[in-house]
């Protein structure tokens, strides 16, 4: 079991000394499920990237804003948001640490089962 608070504080310390203003650690990897803590210093932006099939962002510290085509909401400590299913980035409005939860793929057998269940009649 990981202490997310301690991990987030450690990564924020690393981000402050990083030339790129960020630090991250993947703390859970189970099949298609990934969870990582990402720390960013104020003003640091993660460039736009593709979204996995399902993902959420939980802000542990600070404030962030999702960026991209449609813009995005500002999120503050304690808030959780589902990530949009479109290219997006992340901007730290102040020093911040977030937990990214992502499902990176769905096994083919599960996709077939879901597709069959969604097909009428």
Report the location of each language-model feature.
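A short, N-terminal "cap"/entry segment at the start of jelly-roll beta-barrel domains
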Residues: 1-32, 67, 114-121
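Conserved short histidine dyad/triad with adjacent acidic residue
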Residues: 20-21, 31-51, 85
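Short beta-strand segments in beta-sandwich/barrel cores
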Residues: 44-46, 62-67, 80, 88
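Glycine- and acidic-residue-biased ligand/ion/polar-headgroup-sensing regions
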Residues: 52-69
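A cytosolic small-molecule/anion-sensing beta-strand core signal
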Residues: 60-61, 76-77, 94
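Short acidic-glycine-tyrosine-enriched beta hairpin
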Residues: 69-85
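Ligand-binding loop in jelly-roll beta-barrel domains
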Residues: 85-108
């Amino acid at each position: 079991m990981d202490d997310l608070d301690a991990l987030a504080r450690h990564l924020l310390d690393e981000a402050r000394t990083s030339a790129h203003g960020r630090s991250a650690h993947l703390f859970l990897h189970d099949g298609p499920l990934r969870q990582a803590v990402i720390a960013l210093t104020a003003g640091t932006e993660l460039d736009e990237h593709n979204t996995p099939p399902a993902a959420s962002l939980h802000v542990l510290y600070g404030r962030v804003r999702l960026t991209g085509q449609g813009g995005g909401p500002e999120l503050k400590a304690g808030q959780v948001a589902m990530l949009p299913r479109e290219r997006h980035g992340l901007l730290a409005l102040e020093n911040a640490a977030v937990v990214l939860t992502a499902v990176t793929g769905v096994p083919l057998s599960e996709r077939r089962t879901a597709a069959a269940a969604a097909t009428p009649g």
